[in-house]
A protein has these predicted regions:
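C-terminal hydrophobic helical "lid"/dimerization subdomain
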Residues: 1-5, 228, 251-255, 296-360
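Glycine-rich beta-strand-centered segment in the early N-terminal region that forms part
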Residues: 22-36, 50-97, 134-136
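Residues in the short beta-alpha loop(s) of Rossmann-like NAD(P)-binding domains
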Residues: 197, 269, 295
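Glycine-rich cofactor phosphate-binding loops and adjacent beta1-alpha1 units
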Residues: 160, 167, 207-287, 328, ...
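Residues located in well-ordered beta-strands
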Residues: 4, 20, 32, 66-68, ...
Length: 360
C-alpha cells in the first residue's frame, strides 16, 4: 500500500510522491497523520536546505504533526491503536555529555523526526518512549501539531530570566515571535513587539503585546529609538529576543537592551553568517547574550498542557487549512510571504477539519 508524501530532494526541490506506507518495527508507532502545520524552519529549509535535518535525501519533510495511531510494533506500552496523539520531532539520547548535564537540546546524538507532510508517519522507538503524548478530549489535531513551536518558544522564554514587570522586546512578528510574546505576557512582562507585515502585526495585541511597532518604513536606528521610548528613562529593554534570524537584527537586539540586560538570539541565521556587534556596549554594558536552539521533552509536555488548558490560542496563527495535496502551493505562498502559518490536512481527515475522532 502507498501513501501521499512530500519528499525533500534539495533546496527548492520538494516533490509530492506516492511512497510505501512504512511498517512499525519493535517499539515503533505508525501514525495516520490528521494535521501537519508549516514552520518557518521548513520554509528556510525549502529555500536553502538544512545542515542538521537532512543528511541523506530524499527524505520526508515537515515536523509539526498530530494524528491517530494506525499500527504499533512489538513491545510498545502505554498506547493503543486509535489513540489520538502528538509526536515531538526529536528525542535526546539521555547519556551523552550534555544529556548528563540536563542540556537535552544540545544532545550530541539528538534524534530528529521529519515526514509530517504525509498521510502516515513512522515514529521511532526513542521518540515513542520519550516524546509521544495522547491528546485530551476536545484538543484539535491542528492545535496539537503546534506543540512543537510552542515548546521552542517556551525554551526561549525559560532562558530569558523574565520577571514580572520586566520590559521584553520581541524583534519579529512571525509565528514564533507572537508565541514568544504570548508566553512573556504570561510571565507578567510588559511586551513590545516590532516587526513587518500588516497581517502579522494585526495579531500582536491578541498575543500579548502592549506596544506594537510597525518597522516596515523604519531604519534600524529609528526602531531602536522608538523601542527605547517605551522603556524606563529610555534605558532600553530588560530582555530583547531576536526572532527573525538575520545579522542586522541580531546587532539591533544588542543595541535595544539596557545595561545589565539580556539578549536572546532566538532566530537562527544561515550557517557561516557573521555578526558585527559594538563590543563597548556588550562589555561596559555588561550584557548577557544567549543562543537558543530547539526544545526538550519536558518543555514539549509543558507546551501541550498550555494548549490543552487553552492558555495560548495557537490555532489563531493558522491562516488557512489546505488538503495535503496542496503542499507545494502552500510553500509557494509562504516563500512569497503570503499568510502566517498553514495547516495541511490529509484526505482522510479533510471533512472533519482535523478534530479528534477516536479517544480512549
Amino acid at each position: 500500500m502507498t501513501m501521499l508524501a512530500a519528499m525533500f530532494y534539495g533546496p527548492m526541490d520538494v516533490r509530492l510522491e506516492e511512497r510505501p506506507i512504512p511498517l512499525p518495527g519493535e517499539g515503533e508507532v505508525l501514525i495516520q497523520v490528521a494535521a501537519a502545520t508549516t514552520c518557518g524552519t521548513d520554509v528556510k529549509t525549502f529555500r536553502r536546505g538544512h545542515p542538521l535535518l537532512f543528511q541523506q535525501v530524499p527524505a520526508g519533510f515537515g515536523h509539526e504533526v498530530a494524528g491517530v495511531i494506525a499500527a504499533m510494533g512489538k513491545d510498545v506500552t502505554g498506547f493503543h491503536e486509535g489513540d489520538s496523539v502528538v509526536a515531538a520531532n526529536s528525542a535526546p539520547c539521555q547519556y551523552c555529555f550534555y544529556c548528563r548535564r540536563g542540556r537535552y537540546s544540545l544532545c550530541e546524538n539528538l534524534l530528529f523526526l521529519n515526514g509530517a507532510y504525509a498521510e502516515y508517519l513512522l515514529v521511532p522507538e526513542r521518540i515513542v518512549r520519550q516524546n509521544l503524548y495522547k491528546l485530551e478530549p476536545g484538543t484539535s489535531f491542528i492545535a496539537a501539531a503546534m506543540t512543537e513551536p510552542l515548546a521552542c518558544a517556551l525554551h526561549g522564554i525559560e532562558a530569558s530570566d523574565i520577571h514580572p514587570g520586566d520590559t521584553v522586546v520581541v524583534i519579529g512578528a512571525g509565528p514564533l515571535g507572537l508565541l514568544l510574546a504570548a508566553i512573556a505576557k504570561l510571565h507578567g512582562a510588559y511586551v513590545v513587539i516590532t516587526g513587518r507585515g500588516a497581517q502579522r502585526l494585526s495579531l500582536a495585541h491578541y498575543y500579548g503585546a502592549d506596544v506594537v511597532i510597525d518597522a516596515n518604513a523604519m531604519s534600524f536606528q529609528e526602531q531602536e529609538a522608538v523601542v527605547r521610548s517605551h522603556t524606563d528613562e529610555q534605558r532600553g529593554a530588560d530582555v530583547v529576543i531576536e526572532a527573525v534570524g538575520s545579522p542586522e537584527t541580531w546587532a539591533l537586539a544588542a543595541r535595544m537592551a539596557r545595561h545589565g540586560g539580556l539578549v536572546n538570539f532566538f532566530g537562527g541565521c544561515p550557517s557561516g553568517t557573521e555578526v558585527s556587534l559594538d563590543t563597548r556596549s556588550v562589555h561596559y554594558g555588561e550584557l548577557t547574550a544567549k543562543g537558543i536552539f530547539h526544545h526538550t521533552p519536558v518543555l514539549f509536555q509543558q507546551a501541550l498542557e498550555l494548549i490543552t488548558d487553552h492558555r495560548i490560542d495557537v490555532e489563531g496563527l493558522i491562516t488557512a487549512r489546505f488538503p495535503l495535496a496542496f503542499t507545494l502551493d502552500v510553500f509557494d505562498m509562504l516563500l512569497r510571504k503570503q499568510g502566517i502559518k498553514y495547516a495541511l490536512i490529509p484526505a482522510a481527515f479533510e471533512l472533519s477539519l482535523a478534530k479528534p475522532t477516536s479517544l480512549e
